[in-house]
Amino acid sequence: MAEDSLRVGMISSGLAVLLNGEDAKENSSKARIVPHFDYSGHRPLERTIEFIFGLAEKSVGPLDGQVDSSLIRAVIKNQFSKLHGDLDVSVSQREGISVVHHGVGPPIVGLEEFSICGDIRIVKPPLVLESLALFSSARANACIWKGKWMYEVALETSGIQQLGWATLACPFTDQKGVGDADDSYAFDGRRVSKWNKEAEPYGQSWVAGDVIGCCIDLNCDEIYFYRNGVSLGAAFTGIRKLGPGFGYYPAISLSQGERCELNFGAYPFKYPVDGFQPLQEAPTRFSFATELLRCFSRLLDRPDRSLADTLSRLRRFASVEELFCPVSSAICDEFFYILEQDPLLAEYLGRGAFLSFLLETFRTQAPHDSSSLDKVLDVFLEFPQSHLIFEHVVNALACGCKTATLILTECPYSGPYPYLALACHLFKREELMVQWWRSLHFEFLFEGFLSCRSSNKHDLQHLMPVVWWPGSSEDISYESSMGFTISALSEAINKIEEKQRNLCLLVIQFIPPVSPPQLPGSAFRGFLQNLLLKNRGADRTLAPSGVTRNSVLVSLFSVILHFLSEGFAMLKSSEAVHHNVGFLHRGGQQKFPLSLFLKNDPHRADITRLGGLFSHISKSYPTDDQEEEIMRWEEGCMDDEQNRVTHATEQKPCCCLAYDTDLTKSLKDRGKNTAQSSRGRCSSIPERSSHVAAECSAGSFSEEIDDKPSTSNQSDPDFGYRPVRFMRTALQESRISSAILSEEELLDALLLLYHIAVAPNFKQASYYMSHQSQSISLLEETDKQIRERASCDQIKRLKEARNNYKEDVMDCVRHSAWFRISLFSRWKQRGMYALCMWVVQLLLVLSKMDSVFVYIPEFYLESLVDCFHVLRKSDPPFVPSTTFIKQGLSSFITFVVTHFNDSRISNTDLKDLLLQSISVLVQYKEYLEAFENNEAATRHMPAALLAAFDNRSWIPVTNIFLRLCKGSGFSSLKNGESSFSSTVFQALLRDACINDGELLSTFLNRLFNTLSWTITEFSVSVREMQEKYQVMEFQQRKCCVIFELSSNLARVLEFCTYAMPQAFLAGTDTNLRRLTELILFILNHMTSAVDDEFFDLSLRRQGQPSEKVSRGILLAPLVGIILNLLEASEDSKPKQQHDVIGLFASMDCPDTVYYGFQYLLEYNWDGCVSGDDAYVKKLGQLENFLSHLINRASSQEPERKEESFNKDTTDIEDNTCCICYAGEANAMIAPCSHRSCYGCITRHLLNCQRCFFCNATVIDVIRDKEEEEEEDDDGHKRST
């Protein structure tokens, strides 16, 4: 392993190997012995002791009698001390440094309290810091003016931190810190800049877990920074020389919430730099103690040394077993005596040489040498002082997990693995587990063990030096090379996650030694609750201080997901394997304690519920009588009989099917969205674990899990399958101690962890995967242009652009591959699918209970929806899309269609989330079929969609309508589109409109208003660009979006005229009149406002096909609207409908009408519709319509002129409507008695309930008596 910390103290990996002699061959029970060739006459016992302690030959005099610890101590104090006593004499000159020292004892380098500006909290003594103020700065108490010095900073967070050096003259304020003044120098990896009054680009971006080395060379007047031992180059040169007392101080500045750990030399550096000294002087006698550990290492019987090496050192043999006890006891006596002499030595050794000694004894890679390590622990733990050094060992192991770097050549035993493996073995010792649990920083260290260092662009370049993607021009060997790399990294991640699970299981099994006695799981439960409490608000834009690292939360999510999905196998005996069914895969009766929702626990106080805040809901829905209840139901009870797929049915859900996908092969098949058939190597467990397979074939899944404290394993033999699918019972289990770690509580924590930590990672993964596709397209387009261009200048620019695009693609490929490795392993996908099944059934069951449903936390719904879509879009795909919903998640369809307009959900963003899910799913044929086959969707969704079309949700509703109504418009004549139509929902939408006239009227009014607004906005945006004589990217993007929205709305309106033409042709003519005005309004803006060339320029973006932005996209629905109304008019009796042609002819803008329809006839429809006979026939109908319109307008022209003349020469009658000046004022508004025509009043009241004369609230509209008596044959009142 390449970690420097594993080599601190230079402990030799060579241990005394005692090979079997002839006597051992005869009796295998005897101890191993070292070969003996007695050429010198020296006895073997003395020679063996000399070898163990590294003494020269004959240094130990003849020994008579038995060797005991007192004799060995004498050897240590005499011969060994003489040989190594001068090791701790400082060889290097520590001139040029002074440490401000307060009190007695050796000087300790730390922060100078009076220098702190802002608010810095000590998270963990001595130097784990966090800024609580917006900007905090501080200096250390060490001043340097000569020599080469360094200190290290381990980043707990990766935000804005300025690390470096400053003099006393550097002022610290709430806005200025290190690097913001003369003689002040800093590096900030978040902004990738160095600071000395001004910022300049420098270095690499940093991530949480990085170790930054801050080095200053006052001999050459230079400052360097290192990231994980790699030099970032000289940051500053020619810095000013200063004298004693006026030198440079280590200094840091942190923004709010940023954390780091400073090491000035209190323990060995993780990445020491040759020639640079630590600011804190090393403790005395640390080298002597290190040599003692080296001696102990030689004492161990290890079979990994060669025979030749042993024979070259030893020429005689002696029994090691006889020497181990006295020698090891004497070494430990001396070792702990040294520790007592210097209080600083325990930390220096515990985080340095002693840790390296343990790691090398145990081995950093499998197979581990547990027996040798146990022998070491047995000896050291006999000494009461051992707790001093093991406390620092645990600290070092946790810190090592935070900062360990994955190295490809060391996979799979790389990164945090060696530290986790050693920690798991140590904590099997009860005394060490108790010591860890009793420490003040148990939870902080536990978080450290669950940490994993992140990777930035440069790290991924080292992890994946070779990159390949489908269609790349790279050598074919790159594909296999990247495949091997992904396999190696996947295995490494699996090893790390396995050790994290082992550690958590140890904590779960641990029983704290307290009174009254606690049950297993209480320690883990307390840690989990405190962690969630600390991370309240972690999902906010500005997270509060103290928030845990994302990697900790993600690791904990993986641990809990594995427990709930794959079971607690490591807690079970081999006889109980058949009972070990994961909680999420356990079929039959399900249950959930309502107390998780109805109790306002501290870690839930700030969590928003579906109905709002807990304090607000509790006033309307008291919870006193429900807190102790358990909700029970049968799996699948909320599904339709024909769609029900459960763990108990013959057809199994997707999470229990053997779809095995090779992660490396997904590189070849990106974008195909098909599951692979080969078995992957990215999981440490079988792709279809045995207990899941057993569960799928079992008939009952409510067996009690042996040795597992849980509230979810109680069976109710009397429940069975009853007509009442779910029931509520008193919570008898609640009388058991609350320290029990229940699986339902783990599920609750799992969803919250997903919401605050895992979901953001999936969003990043989605970004890189989608950006990769875009970058590949740009790269391919650039390659095409290079082949077609002949100009040298153009080729040069294109090649530069190509290099940039290629770098972008490679970066995206690496990030995408890393996310697939870390997030999309097979068992995680299986567990997440089962999680979605479980949660959606829970929500549907609780939805029947208003008093409980409103208390469900919002993150339940958000996590469910996000997890569902992550699995749906996963790459490689979890299962084929044709079975994704059908075999297990049909309940999800039921939930989204019944709750996207649920009044009990107070947060409109959540309703939008459900609505957007529908909008996305109906874009795919296989998912649309699932909607058509879902009873709740066909019964509830059509009317609910019409009602949801409002000022907030009109965009997703429009997209849904557009998908459902495909194939019913003029533009659908284009080949292929009609094959994706949904005749089922088209009929359901038509029926919903016919059966609810008020709903239809409201919907059409909103549709008219919205389309008018989008057309106006589009026209204004185009005009603004034309006036500025340039097309700005933002304005162009805005125009494209508004144009697309307008086209979509027009197509929805076209469908309305196709499916329910009588809404426009019968009844009042308000809808038809508004439709006519809107058509002319659109035609006017599309044909006269802007010239064609600028219009196309304002819409067309790079890489977008011309047919997607042509005028025909918006004009085609207008043709369809007119033709739909004409066809409906021909099928109805003339007296029962309004005159469409007459209404167009009566408009006051005949020129707009004529030129608009003439433009439609002459427009080139290529790309919008196909050129078949149906298309020609449709245009022929439009031409006939225009002919009739011209004739009607011509016949009405004399009458129009006469009417216009009369208006100019006579006064307007008192009874004429003063709004439209076209009709008679035949209605009165109550209570203000203002009069107008009934048509104007009703149209106004569609959007406003106040009088348009005096703004009084309208109570009633009273029509004149003779008007009320005028009715047509169907009983509809005629419009005046």
Curated annotation (Swiss-Prot):
Top EC class, one word: transferase
GO BP, one annotated term: ubiquitin-dependent protein catabolic process
Zinc finger RING-type: from-to: 1217-1252
Catalysed conversion reaction: S-ubiquitinyl-[E2 ubiquitin-conjugating enzyme]-L-cysteine + [acceptor protein]-L-lysine = [E2 ubiquitin-conjugating enzyme]-L-cysteine + N(6)-ubiquitinyl-[acceptor protein]-L-lysine
Catalytic activity, EC: 2.3.2.27
UniProt GO molecular function: ubiquitin protein ligase activity; ubiquitin-ubiquitin ligase activity; zinc ion binding
Record's GO cellular component terms: membrane; ubiquitin ligase complex
Subcellular location: Membrane
CDD domains: RING-HC_RNF123, SPRY_RNF123
Chain ranges of the B30.2/SPRY domain: 82-269
Disruption phenotype: No defects in growth and development, but reduced susceptibility to beet severe curly top virus infection.
Additional remark text: Favors geminivirus replication by up-regulating the host cell cycle.
Name of protein: E3 ubiquitin-protein ligase RKP
Species, as recorded: Arabidopsis thaliana
